[in-house]
Amino acid sequence: VSIALSKRFSVEDMDDLYAGIRLACQQYNVDIVGGDTTSSLTGLAISITCIGDADKDKVVYRNGAKETDLICVSGDLGAAYMGLQLLEREKVVLKGEKDVQPDFSGKEYLLERQLKPEARKDIIEKLAAANIIPTSMMDISDGLSSELMHICKQSNTGCRVYEEHIPIDYQTAVMAEEFNMNLTTCAMNGGEDYELLFTVPIADHEKVSQMEGIRLIGHITKPELGCALITRDGQEFELKAQGWNPLKEDK
């Protein structure tokens, strides 16, 4: 853990930060083995490097999806994005106001999803307990559409995802309506959910469909069929990746 901080941060601030880091390490069974602390002219910079190992036969990559595999996601999607929209709205509303607190009542779940995401270690443990080995997997950080297209490109496949099966929390739906945003777009392209996207052989359908916290949302197809979203009324739309790409050049 390497940290650069300015004079406006107190020793107590650093104690609180490391208390949170230690709590996360305990939760995920991780040891802090080193780091560096230095001064910064402005602001705060935190750089964390994580190193681990795994049995070779248990490592799952992006490139293993096969035709007819089932596409699965953990948790629900779009909540982190709506949490961000909520925070940005309150920032604008309260700009210049003093002694006024933002009203987040009833929206705590959305804020938690944006501000305190958690790695889905529990899903990995459930899959292992059920003896299910995914054929491909990655986390959903840049949006479901973007990650699906990554898996399909790496695996040389296409996919079909069904709108009616995409898991969305009630609070996410309410906020999308309040912001006049398309709910499916929020779920497909919002990003920062940090849920797991993975594929499993169709032979595991019965086992995975009964697992709490996992939703079957589609299947893998031949590459020539491309990647598409099937809407509730049966229309087919090509998937568009609108997720963040740090290597893309601005035009």
Language-model features, listed with the residues they occupy:
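Short, well-ordered alpha-helical segments in soluble proteins
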Residues: 25, 55, 75-81, 88-91, ...
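Polyanion-binding loop/helix "lid" in catalytic or ligand-binding cores
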Residues: 101-148
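Internal, well-ordered alpha-helical segments in soluble enzyme and binding-protein domains
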Residues: 17, 44-47, 64-67, 73, ...
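Short beta-strands and strand-loop turn motifs
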Residues: 1-3
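Phosphate/diphosphate-binding glycine-rich loops and adjacent basic-rich segments that engage nucleotide
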Residues: 56-115
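A generic local secondary-structure boundary/capping motif
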Residues: 22, 35-39, 56-64, 74, ...
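Glycine-/charge-enriched secondary-structure boundary and capping motifs
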Residues: 8-33, 38-46, 51, 129, ...
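Hydrophobic side chains in well-ordered alpha-helices
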Residues: 59, 83, 123, 147, ...
